[in-house]
A protein has these predicted regions:
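C-terminal motif of bacterial Sec signal peptides marking the signal peptidase cleavage site
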Residues: 22-25
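Terminal, low-structured helical/coil segments at or just beyond the last alpha-helical repeat
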Residues: 31-45, 221-275
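Structural marker of alpha-solenoid helical repeat scaffolds
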Residues: 49, 83, 117-118, 151-153, ...
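Alpha-helical segment of the N-proximal tetratricopeptide repeat
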Residues: 49-83
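Helix-start (N-cap) detector for alpha-helical repeat units in TPR-like alpha-solenoids
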Residues: 54, 88-89, 122-123, 155-158, ...
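Canonical tetratricopeptide repeat
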Residues: 59, 93, 127, 162-163, ...
């Protein structure tokens, strides 16, 4: 279930892996250590020519991907793999590209290859988990999110926790969804998707007061135009359950303004609050 409007069909974890790919250095044989035991700082001069080529190609691939120029992005990844046939991030990037191109079989092949090359890479686990969840394979996806979250070296675990919660919501496992989402909230309180997902969890559990708490937070941490019709309709239904006609009308105005032709707005016009 999608809660935030996106420019393309990107999963919530895509931005993370793009950042990881763009910033990842290509490791050499290892920096020298002195008596202190501390490693020398790795700089650009420590990279081999092949490693620099891979990094440049991957940065170009990310740029094309963000512009939705998937064929050009794919070409850059292929060139990166010519320089380093075992570059895990390149296979992960190619998985994302194929996913956006609708080539789901090729996407999975590359995600699996990336995971085999770097089984401890949390970003790759997160993105493969997101792929599986979008395919409805929740039972396979959740262990991958768990693996990412268990990695203490993972610098940005909040989106993975949110993705896991969103995935659990798909199978109406509200207890697991709540657990994952509260973890995400603790890590990054202002992540809009997490607040929207928690509002959904508590609405489904008929705890409308707590649902409204996260709807109110969402109003503070997200731009109104970024919210999907689904989220705005959820906000309307929460206010309807609480009997707050003023707030209900306010959210309805936003739904009409930003998504006038949506099925959610049509449902609001019918008064179909319990569908």
């Amino acid at each position: 279930m999608t809660f935030l409007a996106q420019r393309s069909r990107l999963s919530p974890a895509t931005i993370l892996v793009l950042a990881a790919v763009a910033l990842a250095g290509c490791a050499s044989s290892g920096p020298e250590r002195g008596k202190s035991g501390q490693a020398e700082l790795v700089t650009e001069s420590d990279q081999t020519s092949a490693q620099r080529k891979v990094e440049i190609r991957m940065q170009l691939a990310v740029g094309y991907f963000e512009q939705r120029q998937y064929t050009f992005a794919l070409d850059q990844v292929k060139l990166a793999l010519v320089a380093d046939p075992n570059h895990a991030d390149a296979y992960g990037m190619r998985g994302l590209i194929y996913q956006q191109m609708g080539e789901q079989g090729l996407a999975e092949d590359n995600f699996v290859r990336a995971r085999k090359l770097a089984p401890d890479n949390a970003d790759l686990a997160n993105n493969y988990g997101s792929f599986l969840c979008q395919a409805g394979r929740v039972a396979e996806a959740l262990p991958l999110f768990d693996a990412a979250l268990a990695n203490r070296a993972y610098r940005s675990p909040a989106p993975a926790a949110n993705n896991a919660g969103s995935c659990a919501l798909k199978i109406k496992d509200y207890a697991s969804a709540e657990r994952y989402l509260l973890q995400a909230l603790q890590l990054t309180p202002d992540l809009p998707a997490t607040n929207a997902n928690l509002a959904r969890v508590y609405f489904e559990k008929r705890d409308y007061v707590r649902a409204n708490f996260f709807i109110t937070r969402l109003n503070k941490v997200a731009k109104m135009e970024s919210l999907t019709a689904d989220v705005l309709w959820l906000a309307i239904k929460v206010q309807h359950k609480l009997g707050d006609t003023g707030a209900e009308s306010g959210w309805a105005t936003q739904l009409r303004r930003h998504h006038p032709g949506s099925t959610e707005y049509a449902a609001y016009q019918r008064g179909a609050f319990d569908e």
